[in-house]
Amino acid sequence: MAHPAQLGLQNATSPIMEELIAFHDHALMIIFLISSLVLYIISLMLTTKLTHTSTMNAQEIEMVWTILPAIILIMIALPSLRILYMTDEFNKPYLTLKAIGHQWYWSYEYSDYVDLAFDYYITPTYFLEPGEFRLLEVDNRTTLPMEADIRMLISSQDVLHSWAVPSLGVKTDAIPGRLNQAMLASMRPGLFYGQCSEICGSNHSFMPIVLEFIYFQDFEVWASYLYIVSL
């Protein structure tokens, strides 16, 4: 969950997000070192009065400033490619959840269970309970089991949307007529918030996403109860 005046990323609850945070810190340190070196060279050039007028070429320096950037790019590219392949790894999922974007709400279908489908609308401000978040609460929370691989199938019925939950490191476009998939897993129980991250019309800001991860046994009881009620 984001907080006022927060400088860093949200706390990770999935292995992918932990890898993304580590890569962010890795890239930021490289940028900091490069910026420090550039500022140091600029300060030297502005403060020194010494010049080397007889130098026509410098093969050693040219070799250094050609090889060094290549090494830096490799140091950034290798962990980035590793995370990219991790996001495309789909082990045998325990559960498949389909999210469909509409103007301006989300609908979910539990594809592994019969007739489990819900529409989720934003909770109006005057219905909020103490401690709930404005523009982030919905009338029905999406319930999922923790410590389980969950495959998300994401699409749209009208215009472009984007299904994004920062704490899980997930952001997948919802495109009409196309199914995109993403894998997510939470290592701890709790509520995790997201929003539509693609401009989709006048009420784009009113498409929150709320995932409630619970223990596996509780999820089985919850799913069984809903199945019995739907009969």
Curated annotation (Swiss-Prot):
Residues annotated to bind Cu cation A1: 161, 196, 200, 207
Localization per Swiss-Prot or TrEMBL: Mitochondrion inner membrane
Originating organism: Lagothrix lagotricha
Pfam families: COX2, COX2_TM
Annotated protein name in UniProt: Cytochrome c oxidase subunit 2
Any one GO MF annotation of this record: cytochrome-c oxidase activity
Record topological domains on the Mitochondrial matrix side: 46-59
Function of the molecule: Component of the cytochrome c oxidase, the last enzyme in the mitochondrial electron transport chain which drives oxidative phosphorylation. The respiratory chain contains 3 multisubunit complexes succinate dehydrogenase (complex II, CII), ubiquinol-cytochrome c oxidoreductase (cytochrome b-c1 complex, complex III, CIII) and cytochrome c oxidase (complex IV, CIV), that cooperate to transfer electrons derived from NADH and succinate to molecular oxygen, creating an electrochemical gradient over the inner membrane that drives transmembrane transport and the ATP synthase.
Cofactors (names): Cu cation
Cellular component annotations (GO), alphabetically ordered: mitochondrial inner membrane; respiratory chain complex IV
CDD domains for this protein: CcO_II_C
Any one Gene Ontology BP term: ATP synthesis coupled electron transport
EC number: 7.1.1.9
Binding site for Mg(2+): 198
Enzyme class, UniProt record, top EC level: translocase
Cofactor stoichiometry and binding remark: Binds a dinuclear copper A center per subunit.
Swiss-Prot/TrEMBL catalytic activity: 4 Fe(II)-[cytochrome c] + O2 + 8 H(+)(in) = 4 Fe(III)-[cytochrome c] + 2 H2O + 4 H(+)(out)
Keywords, sorted A to Z: Copper, Electron transport, Magnesium, Membrane, Metal-binding, Mitochondrion, Mitochondrion inner membrane, Respiratory chain, Translocase, Transmembrane, Transmembrane helix, Transport
Mitochondrial intermembrane topological intervals: 1-14, 88-231
Subunit structure: Component of the cytochrome c oxidase (complex IV, CIV), a multisubunit enzyme composed of 14 subunits. The complex is composed of a catalytic core of 3 subunits MT-CO1, MT-CO2 and MT-CO3, encoded in the mitochondrial DNA, and 11 supernumerary subunits COX4I, COX5A, COX5B, COX6A, COX6B, COX6C, COX7A, COX7B, COX7C, COX8 and NDUFA4, which are encoded in the nuclear genome.
Residues annotated for Cu cation A2 binding in this entry: 196, 198, 200, 204
Gene, per the UniProt record: MT-CO2
Membrane topology note: Multi-pass membrane protein
Homology family: Belongs to the cytochrome c oxidase subunit 2 family.
Entries under SUPFAM superfamilies matching the protein: Cupredoxins, Cytochrome c oxidase subunit II-like, transmembrane region
